[in-house]
Amino acid sequence: FDKLKTSPIRFMVPWTLQALWVFLTLNAVLVINTQSGEAPPLGVWDGIGLALWVVGFSVEVIADSQKTAFNAKPENAGKWIDEGLWSRSRHPNYLGEILLWTGIAIFGVACFDGLEMVAWISPIFVYLLLTKVSGVPILDRRALENWGEDPDYQRYRENTPVLFPRIGVQRQ
């Protein structure tokens, strides 16, 4: 990245991609916050969206905290985390992020009219980015490089869903 900074033309590509990422992710918030006139009264969809946002935010914060605490212990150096939320999902932090942005889009559903439905691009973009482009594919590839031959990791990978946990199902 530092090499890109020395050339304005080459630096423009990642900068533009980051700007696009921010715009697409914030799209639902922008549509909600730029409504003219009086805001519609809060309804069922607002409650569902807010609840989903709270769940997503909580999952992401808890997952990140658990991973930070795990990585802070010297005896865990070079190991993968498979405790807490990470015992139910291989990427609970990404699950939280996806739920959070989906909750925001649902919260604004009463505001969306016509072309404003483009706000749904936000959670769709976040999901596709994290599951198909950057997050999960890169981390899964790295995990396979590090622990792919380890039978315990193979068992963890086989028994732990990528994102959405199997509620009520015990791990093997």
Segments (PLM) and residue ranges:
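Hydrophobic transmembrane alpha-helices
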Residues: 21-66, 71, 75-172
